[in-house]
Amino acid sequence: MATKKLHFETLQVHVGQEQADPATDARAVPIYQTTSYVFHDSQHAADRFGLRDAGNIYGRLTNSTQGVFEARVAALEGGVAGLAVASGAAAVTYALQNILGVGDHIVAADNLYGGSFNLITHTFCLLYTSPSPRDTER
């Protein structure tokens, strides 16, 4: 599906599951209620956990339903890939861990959510500044 431009409505329905479910021929994305997956042998497991072979290894890390969701959100937002997390706090943590480093200084609004403020100042131990909106020189 990546070769042709699809309309927004089509992306909502089809991206991430271009073919019907092979086990059931269902058009809708199945919700797999599992946490574990079968490996053909120990080498297969080693390759999966070593990230040499793409595929599911444990339900909290990856699963088919989540993969379709991530692909659809990425397509709808015009992105390359997506990452789904279980909460807003997890999303904030992932975002900050990927853009901030040791000794960085963050500038944010003074009404920043308390959980985010504590994550930045206490967990990450970063400097935090909340300038006045009137102070355009800062």
Regions found by a protein language model. Give the residues of each.
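Conserved PLP-anchoring active-site segment centered on the Schiff-base-forming lysine
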Residues: 98-116
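Alpha-helix C-terminal capping segments
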Residues: 75-76, 94-102
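Conserved N-terminal alpha-helix of the aminotransferase class I/II PLP-enzyme fold
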Residues: 41-90, 115-122
